[in-house]
């Protein structure tokens, strides 16, 4: 957190990040607990949507978000290929159980375990330094070797998630709106296609290409993760390489930029693409409008739409506005990380009445 040179700063209760800034075990605990909150929300919302689902109304016209995602993954279909909600309750309950496990882990890291992993005794009772694996994940915000080591593990997990998705589509199958049925999809690892889809991914209409992109990302992320785990800073840590800029606030700002950018991309993708977001589950494509800010409106017949808007409209607009505010948070924290003191702004505004300009001869 930005201290503006104060060695002993005091933060308000609303500055939640200050509680975990230099306490790596609590930092992990907050991440795990946050994961539990997400899992609980996903599970509870899935069960709630399943309880109110009306088979006589198109799914996309019922304002649902969790069940359409499961349907796109090929979950909830009977042997005849019709969506009945089969196994959806299991998915929801599984997420709730996972949320309790995550919550317990978050409490353990926050309350029971050492506040800093650097003081952890590790998995072995002898306490030898080489056996204190948890200590390797201590937080040293201005140490690029420490940060690149932690970043590498994040990238590996992202890569594994991509592999899971690709293998799920290949073995189990996912919903293909072109044939309106579940089918197994083999990834198309054509690097030319993957490169070209950087610029027209919103119009992509082939599930094979979608899976190929995820397969490439899996390779790229795991390779990058291994690189970051195994390597250290090359040469002297100079100002050119970010010395003095790398900090907890800087890392927070980059994280906000990443999630904000992904949310905005998801908004545009969901609004127009019917291969990844089938009309059967999300409703008709949207039309982009401009008012005070950009927004999307429904284009189909809204008669009988339960919530007034399709699932696609809810997802696109909510993602866009969340992404927008995440990016504002990125700018705020990035500017603070660069050393700008926003208190000077409020001080300048407060002293406007007392400001005087003297003209000399």
Curated annotation (Swiss-Prot):
Presence of keyword Nucleus: no
Transmembrane segments: 27-47, 88-108, 149-169, 210-230, 250-270, 315-335
GO cellular component terms, A-Z: photosystem I; photosystem II; plasma membrane-derived thylakoid membrane
Membrane topology: Multi-pass membrane protein
Cofactor: divinyl chlorophyll a; divinyl chlorophyll b
Location in the cell: Cellular thylakoid membrane
Gene Ontology biological process terms in this record: photosynthetic electron transport chain
Entry keyword set: Chlorophyll, Chromophore, Membrane, Photosynthesis, Photosystem I, Photosystem II, Thylakoid, Transmembrane, Transmembrane helix
Induction of synthesis: This transcript is strongly expressed between 4.5 and 72 umol blue light/m2/s. The whole antenna complex is most highly expressed under low light; as the light levels increase antenna complex levels decrease. Thus at least in this strain the amount of antenna complex is controlled mostly at a post-transcriptional level. Transcription decreases upon iron starvation.
GO MF term set: chlorophyll binding
A Pfam family of this chain: PSII
Quaternary data: The antenna complex consists of divinyl chlorophylls (a and b) and divinyl chlorophyll a/b binding proteins and binds more divinyl chlorophyll b than does the antenna complex from high-light-adapted Prochlorococcus.
Similarity-based family: Belongs to the PsbB/PsbC family. IsiA/Pcb subfamily.
Miscellaneous: This low-light-adapted strain contains 8 pcb genes.
Function: The antenna complex functions as a light receptor, it captures and delivers excitation energy to photosystems II and I. The Prochlorales pcb genes are not related to higher plant LHCs.
Protein name: Divinyl chlorophyll a/b light-harvesting protein PcbE
